[in-house]
Amino acid sequence: MSRTMIKNDLKQTDFTEAGEPFRLFAEWLRDAEQSEPNDPNATALATVDPEGMPNVRMVLLKGFDEQGFVFYTNFESAKGQEILSSMKAAMCFHWKSLRRQVRVRGPVEKVTDEEANAYYASRPRGSRIGAWASKQSRPLEGRFALEKAVAEYTAKYAVGEIPRPDYWSGFRIKPVSIEFWHDRPFRLHDRILFERESGGLWTKTRLYP
């Protein structure tokens, strides 16, 4: 039996023994890191614009704990502006190799400057230059304009540290609900919904597929 087949043989006790969602998410993410061909931390991030039109795109999860799920972006981008307008978002992880999915919904907060600085400093130098060079989501007259901006900022920051732009930071989704989904034959899937109560405790409900 292959490793993927073993991982897919998820038993009901795997859900019922989980008293809270974060440990279960950590286990599933570790499994994905072993089975997904690339970017196991990729997630579809959903936002809404001021007119109520939804928007979705892939981002990379850069951290999580009981406080929430963290990703980084340009605050002047479309997603940055939409989040700043509503301060709400949702994300969906789908690991095809494991036939598993996790949905997260909740209000959003900015990460601290200390968190943003630490993560920004850990990025490759080229990515830090890119944060300055790219006017994310705005019209680009041609690839040459982007390459020119990269060259200019590369020269500007040729020596020393590259500071983090004020407009580049991170968001944390503070989940009010986290749903775990596992594929079953004949579409009789397992779905477990965790919902956070006002006191911070989690309730757990099994849902029809």
UniProtKB/Swiss-Prot annotation:
Disulfide bonds: none annotated. Pathway: Cofactor metabolism; pyridoxal 5'-phosphate salvage; pyridoxal 5'-phosphate from pyridoxamine 5'-phosphate: step 1/1; Cofactor metabolism; pyridoxal 5'-phosphate salvage; pyridoxal 5'-phosphate from pyridoxine 5'-phosphate: step 1/1. GO terms for molecular function: FMN binding; pyridoxamine phosphate oxidase activity. Its EC number is 1.4.3.5. One of its GO terms (biological process) is pyridoxine biosynthetic process. Catalyzes the oxidation of either pyridoxine 5'-phosphate (PNP) or pyridoxamine 5'-phosphate (PMP) into pyridoxal 5'-phosphate (PLP). This is Pyridoxine/pyridoxamine 5'-phosphate oxidase.
